[in-house]
Swiss-Prot record:
<dbReference type="InterPro" id="IPR022636">
    <property type="entry name" value="S-AdoMet_synthetase_sfam"/>
</dbReference>
<dbReference type="GO" id="GO:0000287">
    <property type="term" value="F:magnesium ion binding"/>
</dbReference>
<feature type="binding site" description="in other chain">
    <location>
        <begin position="245"/>
        <end position="246"/>
    </location>
    <ligand>
        <name>ATP</name>
    </ligand>
</feature>
<feature type="binding site">
    <location>
        <position position="262"/>
    </location>
    <ligand>
        <name>ATP</name>
    </ligand>
</feature>
<keyword id="KW-0554">One-carbon metabolism</keyword>
<keyword id="KW-0808">Transferase</keyword>
<comment type="pathway">
    <text>Amino-acid biosynthesis; S-adenosyl-L-methionine biosynthesis; S-adenosyl-L-methionine from L-methionine: step 1/1.</text>
</comment>
<feature type="binding site">
    <location>
        <position position="239"/>
    </location>
    <ligand>
        <name>ATP</name>
    </ligand>
</feature>
<feature type="binding site">
    <location>
        <position position="44"/>
    </location>
    <ligand>
        <name>K(+)</name>
    </ligand>
</feature>
<dbReference type="GO" id="GO:0005737">
    <property type="term" value="C:cytoplasm"/>
</dbReference>
<keyword id="KW-0479">Metal-binding</keyword>
<dbReference type="GO" id="GO:0006730">
    <property type="term" value="P:one-carbon metabolic process"/>
</dbReference>
<dbReference type="GO" id="GO:0004478">
    <property type="term" value="F:methionine adenosyltransferase activity"/>
</dbReference>
<feature type="binding site" description="in other chain">
    <location>
        <begin position="230"/>
        <end position="231"/>
    </location>
    <ligand>
        <name>ATP</name>
    </ligand>
</feature>
<dbReference type="InterPro" id="IPR022631">
    <property type="entry name" value="ADOMET_SYNTHASE_CS"/>
</dbReference>
<feature type="binding site" description="in other chain">
    <location>
        <begin position="164"/>
        <end position="166"/>
    </location>
    <ligand>
        <name>ATP</name>
    </ligand>
</feature>
<keyword id="KW-0963">Cytoplasm</keyword>
Amino acid sequence: MKDSFLFTSESVTEGHPDKMADQISDAVLDYIIERDQKAKVACETLVANGFCMITGELKTSVYAPMQEIAREVVKKIGYTDALYGFDYRSAAVLNGVGEQSPDINQGVDREDGEIGAGDQGLMFGYACKETETLMPLPIHLAHQLTFALAQKRKDNTLPFLRPDGKSQVSVRYENNKPVSIDTIVISTQHSPEVSQKHLKESVIEEIVYKVLPKEYLHDNIKFFVNPTGKFVIGGPQGDAGLTGRKIIVDTYGGSCPHGGGAFSGKDPSKVDRSAAYAARYVAKNLVASGVCDKATVQLAYAIGVIEPVSVYVNTHNTSKYSSAELEKCVKSVFKLTPKGIIESLDLLRPIYSLTSAYGHFGRELEEFTWEKTNKAEEIQAFFKR
């Protein structure tokens, strides 16, 4: 008897209000870290109807022109006309950024050159063999759809599209392997002139069938395109957006646990971000090495402490090695102190704007060092000793 179930993940476009906030926060981080690698940045953004507020804490010698940074991000996303509900020219930009607490900083910057964790917390990484990039299929497909929504809007293939949008994909699994797409939900902001019939047909034809892998498509997929019937009011005019509210979209679409810490706007001394990247790096290399088919990795830290307080590996019964053996391997092969992570993944670079939409994982860009599988041979060698 086949074990059959559906699993669903979602994604959002770069014009979604929460993603706008993430992108502004990461643009501020990139601006500062490019000029001051010793900076400590925790940047939070709120976007709402007609305004944007940037707040958080900084420790840096760099002056960051918050207004210019925010407006450039909003312009690049595509909010270039007041008719879209938000316009980069006329939106107010408020700056409420303060200084980082010296009580926090004293535990991070150490006299011995090491870096203490910027906070306590637990972070997860995940990898599996469902896609070439070792990501779960549902979130992989959902990101493909939202990325295509933005591209078809920007290249004028579908000129009636506007920046805000979401996707959701339900995948059918049999015996824990994905076999087909069951349901696709796409909600996209649009101009008032386009008919719902034309919009739905165009989105299915130009995006779904031209973007998604043919082996998962079939005639009985259930499509819900703008199921409420109209989506003209969108972006910050429709909903306020905040940094860090799309943490499942940013990671694995719900396929593994999440420690709760968001990424955007945080420099890599914050283990919420850097250790989550490291956990993905570990999980992906474990799967790429062939010692398992699926891996969930948890790392945990205490504020001001150098070494992780715990390392946990779960291979979901896909490995001949025990969790204890795998954890020993991970500690031997990977540098999991904050400084070790920053140096091994080369994280003191202005790369974070690239991560702030369409997922931090599963995108094999040159800048995404945590997606490399250059530790796979070392893992194999560890188990041949």
